Curated annotation (Swiss-Prot):
Its EC number is 2.4.2.43. Pathway: Lipopolysaccharide metabolism; 4-amino-4-deoxy-beta-L-arabinose-lipid A biosynthesis. One of its GO terms (biological process) is protein O-linked glycosylation. The lineage of its organism: Bacteria, Pseudomonadati, Pseudomonadota, Gammaproteobacteria, Enterobacterales. One of its GO terms (molecular function) is mannosyltransferase activity. GO terms for cellular component: plasma membrane. It is an enzyme of class 2 (transferase). Pfam families: PMT. It is a multi-pass membrane protein. This is Undecaprenyl phosphate-alpha-4-amino-4-deoxy-L-arabinose arabinosyl transferase. Belongs to the glycosyltransferase 83 family. The chain crosses the membrane at residues 7-27, 81-101, 111-133, 137-154, 165-185, 204-224, 255-275, 288-308, 315-335, 346-366, 382-402, 406-426. It catalyses: 4-amino-4-deoxy-alpha-L-arabinopyranosyl di-trans,octa-cis-undecaprenyl phosphate + lipid IVA = lipid IIA + di-trans,octa-cis-undecaprenyl phosphate. Catalyzes the transfer of the L-Ara4N moiety of the glycolipid undecaprenyl phosphate-alpha-L-Ara4N to lipid A. The modified arabinose is attached to lipid A and is required for resistance to polymyxin and cationic antimicrobial peptides.
Length: 550
């Protein structure tokens, strides 16, 4: 009966965090609008081989993540939940692997359930796992690889070992098809410390080639097909998206070596109090095969991405699955022997909630700031933000009331965040980061436009997805579409600032021409170097400028 209650509680937890509130949040640009539009175009065109954005070739990532996103929109429609359905599914599948692997290692159902809840409630997992990017997919394939390698090495027969390594190769191949060759580097680096300490080189050399073969066979059909259709895909993807992004001096998203330290700290909420103990206990018990394996899958990817020049918080998402398992194991030990870490965790959550309440007041219309984050007419959003942090502090306090029994309620600290964050986003943020908000305000003007031009790829993708059209023209800036715009068949999809006046004269009689520009909050739109317009509609950071036929 207790198991049934636990399962009902888990399903209610998943519904409140990962299902019910998702549609209340508008899509963020540039990431969510980009991936939403790529998948919409895939469904509309029926081309499941070559990814396109705004009708242009888009070679930043391989195809598998777009397949899953497209299936999400196909099943649930072109709406906010449909766009995020794929990443939510991947996150829940990863959580299922956490459950299974924990059960496999320790044969403890309570520990397995706790590891799952910890994983799903970690701030970084929840933030990325409900956000339409490709990282939850690659995290799933990496965690699946972690489980597959363990299965292979624990098998007692050659058939079991062969099956495990073949499965490992498939997960690596799908990882390559999701985000590239990092899906090969991370597993290799993660298993080497364990193989070395356990002296299992023989099995690795005997059966490892099976993983290589199955990986190649997984990638080969699509890899050959896209090479035939787009011969320069693999050159661009390998050189620009791997070497330049991660290793060269001009790498994207450059950050210092210690960049991931605050990411790990913030990402571990509401279980931050368990982090030092989980890592220390894992190191202290490193002679235990399972513990050192999980520790290696936590630390090695973190070190790898710390050394790389380009860094983003999403890159280390896969580290948190083994970390959640270590945290759960340590938490049960602490509850049984010395609950000090659990008390510290409760106080950390109280401090975080109280700090958030104070910070919300400071940036509210009633605070000391001259330019508050929220305006007076947005008072309900301020109260939503207060509720988020109040609930966080409340559950932090509740875990301290009887710490040996109530400490696990820390999983409910982010409940307010899950339910209310979509209602607390300030208008000034929505106007710049949520193109859907802009489209809703300007729908009547945008809909009849013959041509729409914009200077932001993220805004362009948002407009294209909301209006169900892929012919948005880039104005002044090419951004990440630069490569796709270089193709001969992309002629006419970019208009420079100097060319705009002539372009306008040539196309004005064809219908309404709409220009959507991103501007600074205090920028005078009358100073823009554009021809006089027939209509201007400013929505704070985004401006709609229209030219009608004469």
């Amino acid at each position: 009966m207790k198991s049934v209650r636990y399962l009902i509680g888990l399903f209610a937890f998943i519904a409140c965090y990962y299902l019910l509130p998702i549609s209340t949040r508008l899509l963020w640009q540039p990431d969510e609008t980009r991936y939403a539009e790529i998948s919409r175009e895939m469904l509309a065109s029926g081309d499941w081989i070559v990814p396109h954005l705004l009708g242009l070739r888009y070679f930043e990532k391989p195809i598998a993540g777009y397949w899953i996103n497209s299936i999400g929109q196909w099943l649930f429609g072109a709406n906010n939940f449909g766009v995020r359905a794929g990443v939510i599914f991947a996150t829940l599948l990863t959580a299922a692997l956490v459950t299974w692997f924990t059960l496999r290692l320790w044969r403890d159902k309570r520990l397995a359930l706790l590891a799952t809840v910890i994983y799903l409630s970690l701030f970084i997992v929840y933030a990325i796992g409900t956000y339409a990017v490709l990282d939850p997919f690659i995290a799933f394939w990496l965690v699946a690889g972690m489980c597959s390698f363990w299965l292979a090495m624990q098998a007692q027969t050659w058939k079991g070992k062969s099956a495990g390594f073949l499965l490992l190769g498939i997960t690596c191949g799908m990882g390559v098809m999701t985000k590239g060759f990092l899906a090969l580097a991370v597993p290799v680096l993660s298993v080497l410390p364990w193989v070395a300490t356990q002296k299992r080189w023989k099995d690795l050399f005997i059966y490892g080639w099976l993983a290589v073969i199955s990986c190649v066979l997984t990638v080969l059909p699509w890899g050959l097909t896209i090479a035939q259709r787009e011969p320069d895909f693999w050159h661009y993807f390998f050189w620009v998206e791997h070497i330049q992004r991660f290793a060269l001096d001009d790498a994207q998203h450059r950050a210092p070596f210690w960049y991931y330290v605050p990411v790990i700290i913030a990402g571990s909420l509401p279980w931050l109090g368990l982090l030092p103990g989980a890592l220390y206990t894992g190191w202290k018990n490193r002679k235990h095969s399972a513990t050192v394996y999980l520790l290696s899958w936590t630390i090695m990817p973190l070190l790898f991405f710390s050394v790389a020049k380009g860094k983003l918080p999403t890159y280390i998402l896969s580290c948190f699955a083994p970390l959640a398992m270590l945290m759960a194991h340590y938490a049960l030990l602490a509850a049984k022997n010395n609950p000090l870490a659990l008390r510290i965790n409760g106080w950390i959550n109280i401090a975080f909630g109280v700090t958030g309440i104070i910070a919300t007041f400071v940036v509210s219309p009633w605070g000391p700031m001259n330019t508050p984050v929220w305006q007076t007419f947005e008072s309900y959003k301020v109260f939503c933000a207060w509720s988020i942090f109040s609930l966080w502090a409340f559950f932090g306090w509740y875990t301290l009331t009887n710490v040996e029994k109530t400490w696990s309620f820390a999983a409910l600290c982010p409940l307010g965040l899950a339910l209310l964050v979509g209602f607390s986003i300030p208008d000034r943020v929505m106007e710049g980061k949520h193109p859907q908000f802009f489209v809703e305000m300007t729908q009547e003007s945008l809909q009849p436009s013959r041509y729409i031009l914009t200077d932001s790829v993220g805004v362009a993708a948002g407009l294209a997805w909301s209006l169900q059209r892929d012919d948005i023209i880039m104005y002044r800036q090419t951004g990440e579409l630069k490569y796709g715009l270089n193709y001969p068949d992309a002629k006419g999809r970019f208009v420079s600032g100097d060319e705009f006046a002539n372009w306008l004269n040539q196309h004005r009689q064809e219908g309404i021409i709409t220009l959507v520009l991103s501007v600074d909050r205090d920028e005078d739109i009358n100073s823009l170097a554009i021809p006089p317009a027939d209509a201007i509609d400013r929505q704070e950071r985004l401006v709609l400028i229209q030219y009608r036929p004469k």
